[in-house]
């Protein structure tokens, strides 16, 4: 760096000269070199000068620590140690020093004729302070002098130097195939409780990083956590980590699924990594996923949680198609009847299917060098089904399928449209809209033809039409035909295919057979759990359970205070009063006279009760003269609910008492949760459904004197627009609890992105950067259904964390994983692969992964990060 005035004595530190640094690499290890660089450079910066130093007046405007933290990624990645101007102008230079602008955080070269650091200063006069990232010398171009720290002056320079030391990953000091952060050498890390072994052991990281394909850090971090999942490893790799886990079946590549095959091939390559290749390019897998979801384009920041949800849904859907295809192949190999209504034959084919090994010989084991088009250039695919003593090779040619009946639905790389030739020849393809219309004669003829033909009882592709046939005779199956014609059944069947679910009522098969079929979905059994919504009506005390499958639990970490909510409601009501939009139609509601104790029919006061139950408007005179009629109505409905409450059985009382206990009803919500347990308590907190969120109770409707009754307890009238004959609006309590089965892998998503409603009604998207404390072990016994708490333990162990740093519009994803991908350098080299044929160690240690940067971490570092998604595995 050129200097006109030097305020300190020239240092004799050999690290001031970059050439001396390179010459000394042979005599020092990387850790010793980094430590010595830090100590001597910091010592040189505070060395007593020969003349009294001057305090630089430009530090206040020239140093912006907040801007430096935003560009810390350039220091952590050695591949980004390039001059900003040289990169922009595509100039290639070697052996030049880099300086960090203390204002914007960009790197600029300084030891050649161009001197881009000075050019940057001449263009932006406030950007005058630069720090050499190797020697840590600070220079001010406005003063044209070096800046030194002396007698509590210029202390902000020390902050910049410490920032560089804690984030710099120099290409001169990194070990082969392993990228380590200098900060791991400056601090003595606490050992994780999952890392067993003596402290004298030395480990080498062999876990590969992933190449950033253009703002794909969200994709790389999610993949790294999935690669660290032991349950997923045990169903793909022939070598198990957890011998106590029950494996449904091995997950293998199949020519009928492009995304699933690319996913399995990537994991197989990752598991076989031994450190020879430090960075992989997930081009094939990302290309297959982007083909299904074009919105995930390169160079555009995306959400890692959205990616995970779509990825798991696609993998489960493709696995379901492969399962159906292989089941039909086994059925044909056993020469079974195309009609699979016999439960014993179907159960036999399911048992035989588990013995089938489906392989794809065209898939190369080297996935990191495979192009995107390799999987789409196959002329035919072959499925070998080995069942008992019979061996049959069934070959399906794509050319034959294209030359077959033109009405048959075509597939590129998934299942054939009709699993039975008989069904294919007797069924014409119709659009889903025509097929789901129960009033369409064409749709009824299709189902009638399928029913009369002894064909398949099969599910079609969700993108195609849905065919269900029955093998029983016409007289016996007439009630079932009505079910098949039902649009509710047809829509439910299509939803089942999209979600990968199976129902014994929809399939009309034995429940045990369908449970066995559904349990064969490997990815679904690993990641899918169940969340139950429990609602108790305050009038009849009836409990309604509504379960739903979940693959992750999204819990909020921000709860606005009641004061802010009242303010927002006031402004919303004020805007609606002066709104020019047409008012909603009012609803006439019949209630009892509050001052009349007799059983006479209630009167309707349209002037005071002309209020929309779903948020309509009352007259302006009522608003100005007295309290809102809607508030009176809500309080009146609550009184009616209490007065009309009936008796409850002992069993229902025990269930309601355990779920809606007195402590859960009285415990307030935690407005500022600090820990993960606080967030889970808020999520499972008892919520009161009242006002606009009243519960439509069907049990109250079935009791006497309810709907349209002139007696007490009548809530709505049969003539009302929003009245339904099968339900009555009641106040109720609601609680969300986890239900059986709990998944082996439990994913928690912290909602850090939300929209804040301002006082003027506009939604401002924001990110919550609050720290949420989480533990390595999580006990979910408090958050499951009461009947499960005494049966088994629900303890989980943390194995992966995804962190998002930055703002809502710009940021970066990194991952912390608990990995086996280490080599014990203190052990003999022959023992590195004795644990399994995959390189690694039996115990697991924490890793920090940022795209292609992989370094060892510790629980002390992981526990302090700003977690976005937490991955737990059941113990």
Swiss-Prot record:
SS bond partners: none
Segments for region (Disordered): 396-486, 575-628
GO biological process, one term: regulation of protein stability
Biased composition (Polar residues): 600-611
UniProt binding sites for Zn(2+) 1: 56, 58, 140, 143
Annotated PROSITE patterns: USP_1 (PS00972), USP_2 (PS00973), USP_3 (PS50235), ZF_UBP (PS50271)
EC number(s) stated in the UniProt entry for this protein: 3.4.19.12
Biased composition (Basic and acidic residues): 473-484
Family from the record: Belongs to the peptidase C19 family.
Protein name, as recorded: Probable ubiquitin carboxyl-terminal hydrolase 7
């Amino acid at each position: 760096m050129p200097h006109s005035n030097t305020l300190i004595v020239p240092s004799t530190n050999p690290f001031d000269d970059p050439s001396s640094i390179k010459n000394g690499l042979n005599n020092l290890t990387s850790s010793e070199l980094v430590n010595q660089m830090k100590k001597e450079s910091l010592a040189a910066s505070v060395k007593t000068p020969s003349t009294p130093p001057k305090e630089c007046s430009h530090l206040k405007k020239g140093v912006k620590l907040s801007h430096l933290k935003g560009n810390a990624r350039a220091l952590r990645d050695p591949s980004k140690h390039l001059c900003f101007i040289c990169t922009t102008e595509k100039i290639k230079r070697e052996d030049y020093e880099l300086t960090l602008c203390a204002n914007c955080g960009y790197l600029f070269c300084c030891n050649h004729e161009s001197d881009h650091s000075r050019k940057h200063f001449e263009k932006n006069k406030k950007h005058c302070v630069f720090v050499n990232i190797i020697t840590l010398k600070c220079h001010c171009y406005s003063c044209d002098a070096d800046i030194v720290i002396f007698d509590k002056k210029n202390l902000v320079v020390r902050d910049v130097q410490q920032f560089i030391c804690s984030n710099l990953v120099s290409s001169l000091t990194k070990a082969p195939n392993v990228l380590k952060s200098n900060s791991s050498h400056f601090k003595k890390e606490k050992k994780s409780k999952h890392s067993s072994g003596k402290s004298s052991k030395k480990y080498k990281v062999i876990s590969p990083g992933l190449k950033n394909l253009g703002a794909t850090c969200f994709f790389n971090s999610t993949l790294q956590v999935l690669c660290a999942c032991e349950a997923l490893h045990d169903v793909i790799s022939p070598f198990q980590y957890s011998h106590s886990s029950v494996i449904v079946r091995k997950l293998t590549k199949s020519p009928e699924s492009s995304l699933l095959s690319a996913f399995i091939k990537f994991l197989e390559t990752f598991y076989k990594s031994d450190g020879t290749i430090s960075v992989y390019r997930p081009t094939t897998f990302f290309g297959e996923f982007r083909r299904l979801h074009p919105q995930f384009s390169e160079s555009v920041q995306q959400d890692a949680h959205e990616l995970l949800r779509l990825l798991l849904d696609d993998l489960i859907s493709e696995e379901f198609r492969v399962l159906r295809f292989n089941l039909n192949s086994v059925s044909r190999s056993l020469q079974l009847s195309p009609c699979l209504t016999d439960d014993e034959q179907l159960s036999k084919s399911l048992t035989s299917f588990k013995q089938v090994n489906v392989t794809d010989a065209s898939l190369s084991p080297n996935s990191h060098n495979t192009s995107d088009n390799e999987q789409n250039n196959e002329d035919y695919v072959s499925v070998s089904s080995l069942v008992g003593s019979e061996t049959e090779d069934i070959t399906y040619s794509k050319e034959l399928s294209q030359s077959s009946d033109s009405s048959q639905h075509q597939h590129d790389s998934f299942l054939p449209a009709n699993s039975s030739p008989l069904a294919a020849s007797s069924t014409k393809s119709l659009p889903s809209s025509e097929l789901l219309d129960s009033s369409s004669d064409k749709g009824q003829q299709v189902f009638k033809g399928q029913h009369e033909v002894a064909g398949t009882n099969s599910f079609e592709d969700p993108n195609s039409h849905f065919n269900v046939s029955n093998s029983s005779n016409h007289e016996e199956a007439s009630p079932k035909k009505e079910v098949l014609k039902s649009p509710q059944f047809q829509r439910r069947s299509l939803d089942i295919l999209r979600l990968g679910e199976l129902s014994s009522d929809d399939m009309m098969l034995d429940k045990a057979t369908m449970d066995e079929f559904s349990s064969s979905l490997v990815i679904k059994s690993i990641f899918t759990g169940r969340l139950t919504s429990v609602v108790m009506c305050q009038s009849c005390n009836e409990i309604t359970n509504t379960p739903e499958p979940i693959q992750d639990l999204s819990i909020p970490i921000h709860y606005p205070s009641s004061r802010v909510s009242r303010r927002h409601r006031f402004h919303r009501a004020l805007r609606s009063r002066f709104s020019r939009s047409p008012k909603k139609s009012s609803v006439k509601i019949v209630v009892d006279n509050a001052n009349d104790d007799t059983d006479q029919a209630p009167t309707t006061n349209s002037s005071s009760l002309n209020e929309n139950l779903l948020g309509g408007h009352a007259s302006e005179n009522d608003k100005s003269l007295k309290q809102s009629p809607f508030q009176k109505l809500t309080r009146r409905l609550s009184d009616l609910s209490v007065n009309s409450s009936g008796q409850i059985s002992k069993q229902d009382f025990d269930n309601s008492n355990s779920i809606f206990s007195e402590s859960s009803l009285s415990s307030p919500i935690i407005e500022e949760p600090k820990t993960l347990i606080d967030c889970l308590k808020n999520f499972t907190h008892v919520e009161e459904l009242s006002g606009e969120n009243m519960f439509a109770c069907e049990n109250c409707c079935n009791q006497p004197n309810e709907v349209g009754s002139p007696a007490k307890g009548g809530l709505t009238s049969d003539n009302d627009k929003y009245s339904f004959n099968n339900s009555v609006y009641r106040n109720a309590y609601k609680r969300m609890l986890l239900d059986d089965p709990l998944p082996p892998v439990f994913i928690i998503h912290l909602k850090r992105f939300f929209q804040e409603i301002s006082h003027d009604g506009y939604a401002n998207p924001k990110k919550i950067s609050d720290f949420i404390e989480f533990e390595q072990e999580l006990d979910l016994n408090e958050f499951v259904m009461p009947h499960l708490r005494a049966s088994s333990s629900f303890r989980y162990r943390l194995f992966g964390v995804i962190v998002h740093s930055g703002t809502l519009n710009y940021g970066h994803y990194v991952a912390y994983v608990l990995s086996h991908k280490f080599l014990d350098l203190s052990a003999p080299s022959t023992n590195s692969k004795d644990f399994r044929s995959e390189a690694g160690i039996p115990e697991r240690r924490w890793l920090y992964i940022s795209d292609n940067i992989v370094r060892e971490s510790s629980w002390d570092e992981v526990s302090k990060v700003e977690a976005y998604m937490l991955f737990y595995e059941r113990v």
